[in-house]
Amino acid sequence: MRDMQDDDTKSPAPPPAAAAAARRAAGQAAPDASALRDRFAKLAQADTPEAATDAAAAADDEVTRIRALIDEMRPTFRRDGGDIELVRVEGAKVIVHLSGACAGCMLAGQTLYGVQKRITDVLGRPFRVIPDIRH
């Protein structure tokens, strides 16, 4: 069986008792085993069908909220002779289609940044708004 070695020094890894003694000598606390157990328990729960259903429901709720935010902004786009439409959401990417005057506008990048900022502010996590190019 191959010895466990540190790639940098090529020396065997210290036994757990020696590692614990070195931590105590350096004034470091031992790792919190209960926190690790809790983390693994949460990871195990994430694999359940209920967790998958909850995650899908949360994603659907985010898409609904993003769609509502874009619908709130549409009158501004239409007033300027353009329009914005939600194409799809892929994780933290929001793909939108700009049409009319907005499609060829030199300020489209700034407009998309404004939409991105609004979505990020309201939903409380970062999103990236990307234009969908249709021909």
Curated annotation (Swiss-Prot):
Source organism, top-level taxon: Bacteria
UniProt keyword list: Nitrogen fixation
Keyword field contains Lipid biosynthesis: no
Record GO terms (molecular function): iron ion binding; iron-sulfur cluster binding
Record has Lipid metabolism as a keyword: no
Gene3D superfamilies found in the cross-reference section: Fe-S cluster assembly (FSCA)
Family per record: Belongs to the NifU family.
Protein name per the record: Nitrogen fixation protein NifU 1
Native source organism of the sequence: Rhodobacter capsulatus (Rhodopseudomonas capsulata)
Gene that this polypeptide is encoded by: nifU1
